[in-house]
From Swiss-Prot:
<keyword id="KW-0244">Early protein</keyword>
<dbReference type="GO" id="GO:0005615">
    <property type="term" value="C:extracellular space"/>
</dbReference>
<dbReference type="InterPro" id="IPR023795">
    <property type="entry name" value="Serpin_CS"/>
</dbReference>
<comment type="similarity">
    <text>Belongs to the serpin family. Poxviruses subfamily.</text>
</comment>
<dbReference type="Pfam" id="PF00079">
    <property type="entry name" value="Serpin"/>
</dbReference>
<dbReference type="GO" id="GO:0030430">
    <property type="term" value="C:host cell cytoplasm"/>
</dbReference>
<dbReference type="InterPro" id="IPR042185">
    <property type="entry name" value="Serpin_sf_2"/>
</dbReference>
<keyword id="KW-0722">Serine protease inhibitor</keyword>
<dbReference type="GO" id="GO:0004867">
    <property type="term" value="F:serine-type endopeptidase inhibitor activity"/>
</dbReference>
<keyword id="KW-1035">Host cytoplasm</keyword>
<keyword id="KW-0646">Protease inhibitor</keyword>
<dbReference type="InterPro" id="IPR042178">
    <property type="entry name" value="Serpin_sf_1"/>
</dbReference>
<feature type="site" description="Reactive bond">
    <location>
        <begin position="337"/>
        <end position="338"/>
    </location>
</feature>
<dbReference type="InterPro" id="IPR023796">
    <property type="entry name" value="Serpin_dom"/>
</dbReference>
<dbReference type="InterPro" id="IPR000215">
    <property type="entry name" value="Serpin_fam"/>
</dbReference>
<comment type="function">
    <text>Plays a role in mediating viral host range. May act to inhibit a caspase independent form of apoptosis to allow efficient virus replication in infected cells.</text>
</comment>
<dbReference type="InterPro" id="IPR036186">
    <property type="entry name" value="Serpin_sf"/>
</dbReference>
Amino acid sequence: MIYIIYRYRYCLVYTMDIFKELILKYPDENVLISPVSILSTLSILNHGAAGSTAEQLSKYIENVNENTPDDKKDDNNDMDVDVPYCATLAIANKIYCSDSIEFHASFLQKIKDDFQTVNFNNANQTKELINEWVKTMTNGKINSLLTSPLPINTRMTVVSAVHFKAMWKYPFSKHLTYTDKFYISKNIVTSVDMMVSTENDLQYVHINELFGGFSIIDIPYEGNSSMVIILPDDIEGLYNIEKHITEENFKKWCGKLYTKSIDLYMPKFKLKMTESYNLVPILENLGLTNIFGYYADFSKMCNETITVEKFLHKTFIDVNEEYTEASAITGVFMTNFSMVYRTKVYINHPFIYMIKDNTGRILFIGKYCYPQ
């Protein structure tokens, strides 16, 4: 039990760190990532890391392993994400390395199916190989991770993808879906298909902080997962939440959730990224500088000098009346309107959303601010 709690804490710190870096980089765009997919990929890299590279990775990885029970320390699958049943969840991570490099048997034994050698000189074939793998692992929801061939001097490329599908515990009634306004800002308004689900007992809280008020609602799926939505009271109030969302604050806010009868109005949306995130600059900003470039030390992988050239991540989400299907995270927005016993929650302006399992581990996290 100590091991699980310790692991969750570091996963949450890492999640908030990388999410805040991304929303700073893309302040006016929808943001969508899968923290567990990225973290498990870093765990794979950690098996081959040494020296200062291993020290930097230990900020997010080694602190977990130090508290792993002795009988699990040599488990070949210790980089895998332990996710309880929550309908369909497929996490796809792969390391592609040059076929001219001879890797240590101990490293290959640990990473198993997450590793593949390729001929980077055949750039188009390698691109198609990677894209076909991603398409298969995401059930066809992401057709391509690479839009152009990799440089022929590439030595190693890390890719990650994830596919999630779960039915709502309280489905929205299709016949109640209607066209409503979505406020991108106070002066910019568009239309969305608004889904409706009434008289459901959900976890909910309204928080008042010095930087503004906001609501949090936890919407369950069948199984052991749920969607958490953070909705500012002010149409343009999401920026203040983004500045203050940390591991400590998020745990504090969610600790105040209580059961309440809710009428929920939530936009139906589908989000598909046209370009992959290259997470190299994001990870460097978080202190993982020695994974990339001259100082990278992956001597536990092989005897040659090798470095990560690209760290790619791409996401997809489909939120409708029956289910959420994602190659990333889903999102919702909320505002209150008090009645005698029920609260009406209208998700009609920018919000943060997450999908988590019942241990609190965040599988997906995103920001929805612009209907596509």
